[in-house]
Amino acid sequence: GNLICLRNTDDIYMKDITVRQSPFWCVHMIYCSRISMNRITINTKYDEKGNRYEGIFNGDGFGPDSCREVFLFHSDITSQDDCVAVKSGRDEEGRAVALPSEKIRITNCRFHSGFGVAMGSEMAGGVRDVLVQDCTFTDSFSIASVKAPRGRGACIEKIRYESCRLVNHDESIKSSKWFKGALYLDCFYGEDEYDVSAFRPVGETTSVIQDIELKNIELETKEGHAVYL
């Protein structure tokens, strides 16, 4: 389960907290507003002696889920999965609730390992107005992953990554259906095979990605594409 879970909660400020070894999403917020976290340390990959945790495969670090006005700053996250995953529910349940994640600010943070700051892939309520600014990514496989697979529905929009730097010398993860590169937008996330020319009807399960801005980004990486669209 989650190590910290906030649900239907507003006006929370957390500071100088260290959380480790969550078997699932580490710090998860759902249906919350006005959450601020300052100088938070999250580690779902290594213990305090540098030994790797075993058996953690979906250990997202920080996860606002159908939340608004969430602020994460001056924090360190080391993850075996997404360091940050902005979500808004999944499939029929997420579309029924229809609460987007919006007005998310992630600034002056340091991310180590994992897959950087992700939008989706659970995004049935929509994700919009997210800023990731002045962050460093060390041995992370990506800065930005925008995952909107067909079938999830809703829209990921007004997402900005600005003044971020990635240096990755870790070659343990190869390009796959789960990972494409340092900056990637993927409407076929998780699919083993797909035909981009195949017709699929447009409806409530059709996912949309639009208005994504990448500005002043530096990349040095050994695995995956630099940019994948």
Question: What function would you assign to each model-found segment?
Answer:
Residues G1-L229:
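Extracellular/periplasmic carbohydrate-active domains that bind, remodel
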